[in-house]
């Protein structure tokens, strides 16, 4: 997990000051059926919120943990990320993710093996979910930077 945490912290620290420097026209540019860069950042906020809940709930809820999905498209629209100030968006994204870093750093080694049942009934563990979260974040950060 240490490498995952280091990668995660690097992604946060490299981008917290970079993202707000992007031109608003670039951040808000829309292609039909695609999210703008602002909306991608908003999606990362939704993902962070949901995963923060998952990463904490798994410690006290019945095992195996039942993974609950969420409607990504609806949340991005309902949260109106496209109209938010980029500094506000970036601060929210950074703050929730800093809390996830704290959780990852303090997670019990045994907890990383806790089983999680996905909606398709496949089984993963907390280690995979945390690692996949960082990979997902990196993918979308690369979209914002492109």
Model-flagged regions — what are they?
Residues 20-23, 59, 108, 145:
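A structural signal for long alpha-helical coiled-coils and helix-turn connectors
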Residues 1-6, 51-93:
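Short, helix-capping/interhelical loops that line the mouth of catalytic, cofactor-
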Residues 5, 9, 25-27, 31:
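An N-terminal domain-cap segment
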Residues 27-72, 101, 115-146:
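Short, contiguous alpha-helical
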Residues 7, 11, 17-21, 76-113:
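Acidic/histidine-rich alpha-helical segments that form the ligand environment
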């Amino acid at each position: 997990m240490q490498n995952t945490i280091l990668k995660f912290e690097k992604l946060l620290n490299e981008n917290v000051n970079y993202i707000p420097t992007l031109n608003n026209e670039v951040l808000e540019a829309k292609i039909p059926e695609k999210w703008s860069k602002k909306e991608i950042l908003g999606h990362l906020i939704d993902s962070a919120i949901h995963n923060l809940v998952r990463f904490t709930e798994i410690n006290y809820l019945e095992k195996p943990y039942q993974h609950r999905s969420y409607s990504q498209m609806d949340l991005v629209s309902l949260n109106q990320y496209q109209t938010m100030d980029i500094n506000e968006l970036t601060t929210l994204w950074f703050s929730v993710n800093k809390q996830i870093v704290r959780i990852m750093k303090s997670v019990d080694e045994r907890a990383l093996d806790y089983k999680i049942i996905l909606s398709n009934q496949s089984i993963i563990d907390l280690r995979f979910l945390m690692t996949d979260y960082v990979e997902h974040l990196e993918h979308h950060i690369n979209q914002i930077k492109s």
